[in-house]
Amino acid sequence: MPQNEYIELHRKRYGYRLDYHEKKRKKEGREAHERSKKAKKMIGLKAKLYHKQRHAEKIQMKKTIKMHEKRNTKQKNDEKTPQGAVPAYLLDREGQSRAKVLSNMIKQKRKEKAGKWEVPLPKVRAQGETEVLKVIRTGKRKKKAWKRMVTKVCFVGDGFTRKPPKYERFIRPMGLRFKKAHVTHPELKATFCLPILGVKKNPSSPLYTTLGVITKGTVIEVNVSELGLVTQGGKVIWGKYAQVTNNPENDGCINAVLLV
């Protein structure tokens, strides 16, 4: 047997202390508090490295939790494929309920320019930087002014991970993050509440597009799978562009018209 493993040897011979497992459980319970105290007291380069490590751990933990929570996976149905006439767009299903996953074709379409269609609002008032981005002063004496807070409605995807607050330049408040839009179909003359997939183009600035800022005239992509729209080839349409027609920051909701 290797040397210096006397504790393991003792445990093999006589077993654990009677309070060993209880002590271990309590120590693990205290660990979070001790780490928090340590993080608060640390300063300088050590603190930076420690916070970076903690931030990476938290991201990993959140991703693991999210992975366990995922239920919308591809599953086989026990029911057999219905006999008789089946629409063309259901032929490739083979009795499977598919998760709401965007195909590569839609991802490719997202990259195309939004200026392909005639939009309901061809001209809109440009939004100035002072209007959209509020200067946030930071530092002990509030002398630093490099942070900006978005004051308009914005869209943030599901897979978005914030940077550590210390290094985050653009702050997008939770109260201004929207995930759904009221989209009107111009031909059907009906309005649907559809999930937003992304911001295609904000006419005011490319910066607002990357930040996902939604103002009047912005072209957004919405999930139209619930409408049951089909292409000429018989495939279901997942994503379509729509233009925002109201001022969401004033109305508290996003109203848009589908670009057909």
From Swiss-Prot:
This protein's name: Ribosome biogenesis protein NSA2 homolog
Organism: Bos taurus
Location in or out of the cell: Nucleus, Nucleolus
Keyword tRNA processing on entry: no
Keywords on record: Isopeptide bond, Nucleus, Phosphoprotein, Ribonucleoprotein, Ribosome biogenesis, rRNA processing, Ubl conjugation
Region (Disordered): 20-41
GO cellular component: nucleolus; preribosome, large subunit precursor
Matching InterPro entries: NSA2_fam, Ribosomal_Se8/biogenesis_NSA2
Protein function: Involved in the biogenesis of the 60S ribosomal subunit. May play a part in the quality control of pre-60S particles.
GO term, biological process aspect, one: maturation of LSU-rRNA
Keyword field contains Zinc-finger: no
UniProt-listed Pfam families: Ribosomal_S8e
